[in-house]
A protein has these predicted regions:
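Charge-dense, helix-prone N-terminal extensions
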Residues: 1-191
């Protein structure tokens, strides 16, 4: 297993400089962040993500280290990695500010070509896939409960279904979503 560096930057400028010099060679890093009220200054998560996007990188898992300190994994974005609406909004901002590096622009080009750029558009817009809607049509209670959930809960179900790669997995997830919604369970995490 590759040992990844653990890096701490006070500012996004330092992070940008590191990525400028290392974005092609590094496999990933753990960035250290401190809470706003902590005695140690650190760049904010949002700043780190924006800089990462400039170079075709993305954030991933986070781990609390206690005492207002946390570690978050950042790495080059995989070609088939889907793009959230938030990250696409950041990209628009970064392009307007002329902050995008060519490696980040190349990542976007690949994503647009392979469909991962728009893969979450229906999820972000709350569009229920036809197969799930048919299942809801057979269970009015599940559908009514689903419609009463906050948009974030509905979106999490749509995302869960969207990420299924095989048809058999999609069918299992549809059945699970219907069962949970029928029981008025807003999230798979609260079972």
């Amino acid at each position: 297993m590759i040992e990844l560096p653990e890096l701490y930057f006070k500012t996004d400028i330092e992070w940008r400089e590191w990525l400028h010099n290392n974005h092609n060679a590094a496999k990933g890093v753990y960035l250290i962040f401190y809470k706003v009220a902590h005695e140690n200054d650190s760049m904010r998560w949002e700043e780190a993500v924006k800089i990462a996007l400039c170079f075709g990188w993305i954030d991933s898992t986070v781990k609390s280290l206690g005492n207002g300190k946390r570690r978050q994994y950042f790495c080059p974005r995989k070609p088939k990695s889907v793009w959230s609406a938030l990250n696409k909004t950041y990209i628009k901002e970064l392009k307007k500010q002329n902050l995008m590096h060519q490696s980040g622009l190349n990542t976007i080009k690949i994503a647009k070509e392979n469909g991962s750029w728009s893969a979450l558009d229906d999820v972000e817009n709350g569009i229920i896939p036809e197969a799930l809607q048919k299942a809801f049509d057979y269970n009015k209670n599940a559908y009514d409960n689903y419609l009463n959930f906050a948009p974030s809960y509905r979106k999490s179900y749509l995302y869960y279904l969207n990420q299924a790669k095989r048809e058999s997995t999609r069918q299992k997830r549809i059945a699970e979503i219907i069962e949970l919604c029928d029981a008025n369970i807003k999230s798979r995490d609260t079972r």
